[in-house]
Structure formats: structure tokens, C-alpha cells
Curated annotation (Swiss-Prot):
InterPro entries, per the entry: C-N_Hydrolase, C-N_Hydrolase_sf, Omega-amidase_YafV, UPF0012_CS
Lineage top rank: taxon: Bacteria
EC number annotated for this UniProt entry: 3.5.1.3
Protein name: Omega-amidase YafV
Membrane-spanning segments: none
Native species: Escherichia coli (strain B / BL21-DE3)
SUPFAM superfamilies: Carbon-nitrogen hydrolase
Length: 256
């Protein structure tokens, strides 16, 4: 059964400067080989800016760059960007394969405390991406607080979060990532940014990968621009879910 080698890039972002951010990640991705999935933070071309979509790089430009990086690294490249679409502005999580196939998920839960819901259109569909034998559920930042949306119906193996999660609530980030892994009996990975943004908001990072029993198998140092690597085991995941099949006793409800 295939394992999954995942890399999280915990990095600062240049405020509202798409080309500068792409150049930064060009440098971070240089020389990375032998990975299956490489993850960048939420809104990696701009930082978490409410006006980002209006002045953002075009989706085609971002996708072309991600495709080139996916081919270079022979890996799925994943991260969210602010985009202007025909139906409105979205916070779109893009997952791009080396062959050019593009998967996307539009952030469902918009952070009203900074009026994200007034600037962006919420997504309305869960997406499962199948990649190299793994089923991946992409989610974005504030989605983490809403467990029904990430409820595992035995339809995914890895919940993958990207975020701009502020330092004052870092305890919530760490606790909720662990909770999502335990309750869903799945791997969870969360890639957060570091540094400060144009609004003076500070970010610790605390990016991590957690196994289905809630054990942290890789974690990034707080406030450090770094990368972390982990290898996920499908055999271990299946063995645990078979030996402790709590998912079979889940309440029968569905809200989407």
C-alpha cells in the first residue's frame, strides 16, 4: 500500500505582491525531490488581504506557475489564492498535478471578524482529491472550527488545511488540528504562515502533521521560516481504523 510523502512550507508572505511571492517560493521549491505533496499557505500570493482578489494574479498565471513547479518537483502542489472569477471573488485552494490537472476547493467558512464574507463568495461543495492512492480533503483556515464540514464519511484519508492563522489563537489551531485527526480517524496536515501582514497581524506558524490517533509526527518551530517533511502510512491508517472502528458508530446525519 502506498505511503504519502508530504512537505509543508511554513513561510512569510509579501503583502499584496504576487510576483514577489512567486519568486520567494521559486527559491523554496528549488531542489525539492522525492515528495508526493508540497503545501504552501493560504493566500500564498498576497497574504490574507480582503482586497487581494481585485488586484491578484490571474488564475491562469497562478495555475501555470503551479503546474511548472509540480512538474519540476514531480509532486502535487497545493495552496490557496485570492482570485477574481466570473461569479465573484473567492479564496480558492488549488491543487495542481504534474500533468496539469487542476483541482480546486473554494473556502466554505469565511472569517466574518475581518469581513471576509463581505469580500469573498463562500464555496458550497466539499471536494475529495485522489492522488497516488490517497484521498485528500482540502480545507482552508477558518474551516477548521467547523467539524461537520470535515466529517469523515470514510471518504478521505488526509484532511489538508492551509491557513493564515494568527498567533493570539495559536492554541486553538493546535488543539483543533489534533481534534480533527482523532474524531475523523484520519491524517491531518496544517500549513500556516509566519511573519506579519500589512494589517499588523502576527503569525506563529505551528505547521504540523498529525496521525489518526492524534500524535504529532512532524511539527515546525514557531516563528521560523522552514519546511517540514512527513511520510504517511496507508497500512497504519487502515489497521487503526479496522482495529478501532469508531467511525462505524457515527451519528447518521449529513448537513451538505
Amino acid at each position: 500500500m502506498p505511503g504519502l510523502k508530504i512537505t509543508l512550507l511554513q513561510q512569510p508572505l509579501v503583502w499584496m505582491d504576487g510576483p514577489a511571492n512567486l519568486r520567494h517560493f521559486d527559491r523554496q521549491l528549488e531542489g525539492i525531490t522525492g515528495r508526493d505533496v508540497i503545501v504552501l499557505p493560504e493566500m500564498f500570493t498576497s497574504g490574507f488581504a480582503m482586497e487581494a482578489a481585485a488586484s491578484s494574479l490571474a488564475q491562469d498565471d497562478v495555475v501555470n506557475w503551479m503546474t511548472a513547479k509540480a512538474q519540476q518537483c514531480n509532486a502535487l502542489i497545493a495552496g490557496s489564492v485570492a482570485l477574481q472569477t466570473e461569479s465573484g471573488s473567492v479564496n480558492r485552494f488549488l491543487l495542481v498535478e504534474p500533468g496539469g490537472t487542476v483541482h480546486f476547493y473554494d473556502k466554505r467558512h469565511l472569517f466574518r471578524m475581518v469581513d471576509e464574507h463581505l469580500h469573498y463568495k463562500a464555496g458550497n461543495a466539499r471536494v475529495i482529491v485522489e492522488w497516488r492512492g490517497w484521498r485528500i480533503l482540502p480545507l482552508v483556515c477558518y474551516d477548521l472550527r467547523f467539524p461537520v464540514w470535515s466529517r469523515n464519511l470514510n471518504d478521505y484519508d488526509l484532511a489538508l488545511y492551509v491557513a493564515n492563522w494568527p498567533a493570539p489563537r495559536s492554541l486553538h489551531w493546535q488543539a483543533l488540528l489534533t481534534a480533527r485527526a482523532i474524531e475523523n480517524q484520519a491524517y491531518v496536515a496544517g500549513c500556516n504562515r509566519v511573519g506579519s501582514d500589512g494589517n499588523g497581524c502576527h503569525y506563529r506558524g505551528d505547521s504540523r502533521v498529525i496521525n489518526p490517533q492524534g500524535e504529532i509526527i512532524a511539527t515546525a518551530d514557531a516563528h521560523q521560516a522552514t519546511r517540514i517533511d512527513a511520510e504517511l502510512s496507508m497500512a497504519a491508517l487502515r489497521e487503526y481504523r479496522e482495529k478501532f472502528p469508531a467511525w462505524q458508530d457515527a451519528d447518521e446525519f449529513r448537513l451538505w
